[in-house]
Amino acid sequence: MRGCAAGPRDARRVFHSAANGTDSAPNPFLTMALIVHKYGGTSMGSPERIRNVAKRVAKWARAGHQMVVVPSAMSGETNRLLGLAKAVNPGQPDAAALRELDMIAATGEQVSVGLLALALQAEGMPAVSYTGWQVPVKTDSAFTKARIESIDDGRVRADLAAGKVVVITGFQGIDGDGSVTTLGRGGSDTSAVAVAAAMGAAECLIYTDVDGVYTTDPRVVPEARRMHTISFEEMLEMASLGSKVLQTRSVEFAGKYRVKLRVLSSFTPWDINIDEEAQSGTLITFEDDEKMEQAVVSGIAFNRDEAKFTVVGVPDTPGIAYKILGAVADANIEVDVIVQNVSHDGRTDFSFTVHRQDFQRVNDLLKNRIVPTVGALQFTADPRICKVSIVGIGMKSHAGVASTMFRTLAEEGINIQMITTSEIKTSVVLDEKYMELAVRALHRAFGLDAPEAVG
């Protein structure tokens, strides 16, 4: 049995990952290696695309590599399945309903692995598919947001030794009671990295509909450029701040177990040379690279799926933050930015942001439970905000970065509602209507449209 955790609160066991090494290790593709491929929903979006994925995987297997593949559900399938669930039970799901939602949502990936295994067999490649519970991938019981506790890789290793490609469902696992669980949106990324960690894979390649990690979303800033490398710290911040390329927990896994990650496109020709393919996209690196330190800001992340609440006129007494946020945490709702104003006349205002999908639940909690309990005067709610962040490992050693950000936004007439900082990022909360203007202005201000330095 080999096990791992998605974060500090899950630390129970440690994956064996001796094969992972460091970024300066020899190229793992020069000799036979165990490689994990992950394909997103768009890459699996049609029979033709699935056949192309199979051809790409078969190419790697024929080159002598042991291959484990983790596909997502076909694009749109998870939404379709959850839409069916909503149609038969439109109410707010309780614990029992969340269990059934996981049972339903997990079927999307089950279809994908079966189709991909069939496509590989059609290519003359021995292949077998497994669901998360068949492996098994063991999780806790937090339905729709489960965390991986351990992976038993014995069955998978036996199939690899027999020359088979193993296709495993992403996004899902099984809890201690035998119930199917899902890891939350983007959970297939986490599944792939966890499998790579458990099996000591040489590298985990994440195939998406983009060809790497960009300085920001090219749909917002056409001049955004692809980065050849990005540090683990920067990628973790970018993912947690709204970048859709990788799911946050997958980056946490990669950092904890030193899994080499590369993000690349599944829409390049499947028959591209393996050595060329293995060097494409963006490598998430663990080296403290001097070249990286020269870039003060590496990227701009943004998230429009946020909502802000302000509890007005709260008694300024010890423990007030816990009284407000404790009830929110008990409802399994994650809080992002938190700001408490300076006290006036013994009262203060307390603001925080949550994911927009939790807006109604938090609104009801504040109205019916929190505000009456803590003695606040009232609360306000704003579901139309966004968060824009600058990220860069060079911010550790450069002064004046935040002031440049604030000046740039002021010159565009954009008001800042909230600010939060860490060693390598500064985030601001803005009115949603200013998001794209802010991202474009900051991208220019920090010179991110300039060519990436080489050497």
Predicted regions mapped to residue ranges:
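Glycine-rich beta-alpha junction loops
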Residues: 74, 210-212, 257-261, 265-270, ...
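Nucleotide/pyrophosphate-binding catalytic subdomain
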Residues: 20, 27-251, 430-431, 446, ...
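Acidic-aromatic/histidine active-site loop/patch
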Residues: 254
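A conserved regulatory-domain signal marking ACT and ACT-like small-molecule sensing domains
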Residues: 273-455
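Short hydrophobic alpha-helical runs that function as membrane-insertion/retention elements
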Residues: 203-207, 261-263, 336, 418
